[in-house]
Amino acid sequence: NNSLEKTFKSSLNIKDADDSIKRTYKIAISVTGEYAAYHGGTFALVNAAIAKTLTNINAVFENDFNVSLQLVSTNDAVIYLDAGTDPYGDTSNNYNNELQATLDTEILEANYDIGHLLSAVGSVDGNAGCIGCVCVNGLKGSGYTSDNTPDGFNFDIDLVAHEIGHQFGANHTWTHNGNEGENVQMEPGSGSTIMGYAGITGSTNVQANSDPYFHAISIEQITTYSKSISCASTTNTGNTTPTVNAGSNLTLPIGTPFKLVGTGGDIDGDILTYCWEQADENDASTTFPSTNSTSGVSFRSFNPSTDNKRYFPRLSTI
């Protein structure tokens, strides 16, 4: 075969935050005594840490799919300052069930839409408890994130935003370890967006940490799920969906570098950014691209920018 044909999925066909509705969900964030101790052991210091994490997450969620997370007013009821008396075990083995029971008892089921636990037990540990369970009683409060240094931008984005992404219906986008069967694994190796595993897959790492945005396929999953549930408070933003054209499909000889140029417009006058992403799902036989790959993912995602063109590969590598 002396040609390579790639058909890029038009962004016009991907479900996104296109209905001009901002969705605000009530989130309950509990913390273990270990997390509280790491952050100084007082309500004021712990609340400041939670606020910083929530600010970083909301910056991404509001930009990518017009979703905002608002801390419940009674959240202090699930902040525990003493590891010896908190309702959580010494390991994360039963965090999912312990958190769900704690939130339903202390916050009450009707008073929150999504719940998450922050802990400082172990290293790089997290589990959403479910895929797509916001607003679902009995499951919505079962996600947790734990790390022995539970602080900083990478903790917030690589770990907490990743697990909350699962709670909102997103699956993994990495391809480093086979196929999960959801047809959304579209990033080489570890991946570099939030639903990947950047920095923790060894030889297939694309980079050390996740970039602060979701892959288009994750945006599609989360947007679809958000539109299917009804517990959010909604606000009509009046924003108009931008127009975009990624250009015609191309058929190229194997190994040929190429350039893609897109065009976009926005009648509201908003500044547009562009992000080119390959939409070929992993087929379980590929984990990392090579010059001999005949299927799977060849190109990684890069941070959105105002530049409407991209070279494949990057000019600096040719």
Residue ranges of predicted features:
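Fold-level signature of zinc-dependent metallopeptidase catalytic domains
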Residues: 1-132
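Exoplasmic/lumenal beta-rich domain surfaces
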Residues: 70, 275-318
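The catalytic-center signature of Zn2+-dependent metalloproteases
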Residues: 72-95, 135-212, 277, 281-287
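Proline/serine/threonine-rich low-complexity linkers at boundaries of modular beta-sandwich domains
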Residues: 222-243
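Extracellular acidic loop/turn motifs
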Residues: 231, 266-273, 281-284
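Short, solvent-exposed loop/linker segments at the N-terminal edge
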Residues: 246, 250-258
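Residue-level signature of extracellular beta-strand-rich folds
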Residues: 246, 260-265, 276
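Extracellular acidic, Ser/Thr/Pro-rich low-complexity tracts
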Residues: 252, 263-268
